[in-house]
């Protein structure tokens, strides 16, 4: 569950290392974002010569949460960190590589991220 002020790791090679959620998109008073949801983030930590720099405001999709996700068969998957992938204005990933596993729930709206990921759970 990601809410405003939550710090997330960045799971791609866009140049950002840590981002902070500043808005959960998808409703006027929506409080939490889960895996697959779109959020507005600001870059808090970035590497030199990356595609993004500190202070940039971008959209991102949540790919891993510590809360995890429950499946219809009763199983649940949790991760050790909260992570997001940064998106451009066309809702396509800024980076060309994805680090770490992602869940099958991303297949519905983010097939590009699933195809770049090294492991899909």
UniProtKB/Swiss-Prot annotation:
GO cellular component: cytosolic large ribosomal subunit
Tagged with keyword DNA damage: no
Superkingdom assignment: Bacteria
First and last residue of the signal peptide: none
GO BP annotation list: translation
Keywords noted in UniProt: Ribonucleoprotein, Ribosomal protein, RNA-binding, rRNA-binding
GO molecular function, one term: structural constituent of ribosome
UniProt-listed SMART domains: Ribosomal_L14
Classification via InterPro entries: Ribosomal_uL14, Ribosomal_uL14_bac-type, Ribosomal_uL14_CS, Ribosomal_uL14_sf
Covalent S-S links between cysteines: none
Subunit comment: Part of the 50S ribosomal subunit. Forms a cluster with proteins L3 and L19. In the 70S ribosome, L14 and L19 interact and together make contacts with the 16S rRNA in bridges B5 and B8.
Family, per entry: Belongs to the universal ribosomal protein uL14 family.
Xref: HAMAP family: Ribosomal_uL14
Record-linked NCBIfam families: rplN_bact
Protein name: Large ribosomal subunit protein uL14
Protein source organism: Pseudoalteromonas atlantica (strain T6c / ATCC BAA-1087)
């Amino acid at each position: 569950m990601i809410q405003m002020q939550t710090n997330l790791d960045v799971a791609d090679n866009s140049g950002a290392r840590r981002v902070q959620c500043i808005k959960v998109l998808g409703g006027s008073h929506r409080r939490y974002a889960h895996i697959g949801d779109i959020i507005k983030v600001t870059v808090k930590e970035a590497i030199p010569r990356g595609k993004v720099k500190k202070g940039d405001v971008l959209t991102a999709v949540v790919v891993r949460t510590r809360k995890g996700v429950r499946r219809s068969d009763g199983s649940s998957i949790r991760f050790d960190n909260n992570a997001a992938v940064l998106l451009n204005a066309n809702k396509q990933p800024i980076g060309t590589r994805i680090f770490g596993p992602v869940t099958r729930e991303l297949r519905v709206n983010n097939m590009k991220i699933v195809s770049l990921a090294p492991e899909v759970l």
